[in-house]
């Protein structure tokens, strides 16, 4: 029976880590290990983790000085001993039968398992529906379709995918420690270079906790600008024409937002962000690309012409939880 290694980076997660761990402990499938990587928390996360480690021989606890989520996950990979690897965030929870679903569907011909998730705003009664794990509809997709969906549908997340640990270690697929946002997208695109079959399950296995006080989208969050660096890396490594179009579209879109963010920040991003011009060769290429939907092209055109206005509208909608 395949062993599942669950890696959970932790930073000041004392209010949520218990719920996260308990959602794993209630799994019917028991051949798993939990690797808790404390990234230099200054709350009582360590105390909570040590108590769980003391009472559960399948829980490993690792402390590292604050080096970021990418290094925490890399540390988890190096200490994992399972066949399959699964990444969680410390404030999220999983379905009670997720591991059964993983084992039933991650057959020998599958290189990556991909399932659905939902956003939640509290932890109460999130899994009322019972699934018959033997009757979940699934399809096999190839690498190109996987990459396209990850980019077009903004689904570069880790926590709704399961990977082969041996492949990750053999190919040395690790997280870029210089990137703090979109590091998961880079990981998925790198992993896709070495695989053939991805199984997509129509099953909601993960609950992503959406905090209304999250600082990520706030206009003065400098970590946001890591997105621009991530897409520069993607542009440099991607050679597939159809996939590259989507990467270039996203890169232009985020450049427009970065330009507007840099204008509104009281603390400026260290690198100059030029305004995207409609007549630039790259802009024209994407705006007339048939691979990109008309809706997306119109959205980009508006952002190019009116970056500050679109950014202000986007910020207002985020505040109202409509975006």
What are the roles of these predicted feature ranges?
Residues 203-211, 217-249, 253, 258-283:
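Catalytic core of nucleotide-sugar-dependent glycosyltransferases
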Residues 12-26:
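Short, well-formed alpha-helical segments that are part of the catalytic scaffolds
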Residues 23, 38-48:
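A conserved acidic beta->alpha catalytic loop
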Residues 85:
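Short aromatic/hydrophobic "clamp" motif used to bind/position activated sugar donors
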Residues 31-40, 60-65, 89-90:
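Short beta-strand/loop segment that forms part of the nucleotide-sugar
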Residues 69, 90-198, 206-224:
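Donor-binding/catalytic cores of nucleotide-activated saccharide
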Residues 64-80:
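Glycine-rich, basic loop-to-helix element that forms the pyrophosphate-binding segment
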Residues 266-323:
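Membrane-interface aromatic/basic loop that binds lipid-linked glycans or pyrophosphate carriers
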């Amino acid at each position: 029976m395949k062993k599942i290694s669950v890696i959970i980076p932790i930073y000041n997660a004392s209010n949520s880590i218990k719920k996260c761990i308990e959602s794993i402990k209630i799994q019917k499938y028991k051949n798993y290990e939990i690797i808790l990587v404390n990234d230099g928390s200054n709350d009582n996360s360590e105390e909570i983790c040590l108590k769980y480690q003391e009472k559960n021989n399948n829980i490993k606890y690792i402390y590292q000085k604050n080096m970021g989520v990418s290094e925490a996950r890399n540390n988890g990979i190096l200490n994992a001993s399972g066949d399959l690897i699964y990444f969680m965030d410390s404030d999220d929870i999983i379905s009670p039968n997720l591991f059964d679903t993983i084992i039933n569907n991650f057959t020998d011909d599958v290189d990556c398992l991909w399932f659905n998730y939902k956003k939640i705003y509290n932890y109460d009664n999130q899994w009322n529906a019972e699934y018959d794990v033997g009757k979940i509809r699934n399809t096999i997709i190839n690498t190109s379709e996987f990459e396209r969906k990850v980019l077009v549908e903004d689904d570069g997340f880790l926590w709704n995918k399961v990977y082969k640990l041996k492949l990750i270690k053999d190919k040395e697929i690790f997280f870029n420690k210089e990137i703090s946002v979109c590091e998961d997208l880079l990981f998925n695109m790198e992993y896709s270079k070495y695989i053939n079959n991805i199984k997509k399950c129509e099953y909601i296995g993960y609950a992503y906790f959406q905090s209304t006080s999250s600082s990520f989208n706030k206009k003065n969050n400098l970590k946001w600008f890591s997105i621009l660096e991530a897409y520069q890396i993607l542009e440099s490594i991607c050679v597939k024409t159809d996939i590259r179009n989507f990467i270039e579209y996203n890169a232009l879109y985020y450049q427009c937002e970065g330009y507007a963010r840099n204008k509104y920040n009281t603390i400026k991003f260290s690198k100059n962000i030029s305004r995207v011009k409609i007549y630039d060769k790259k802009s024209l290429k994407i705006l007339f690309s048939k691979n990109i939907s008309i809706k997306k092209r119109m959205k980009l055109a508006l952002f190019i012409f009116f970056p500050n206005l679109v950014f202000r509208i986007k910020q207002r909608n985020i505040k109202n939880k409509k975006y």
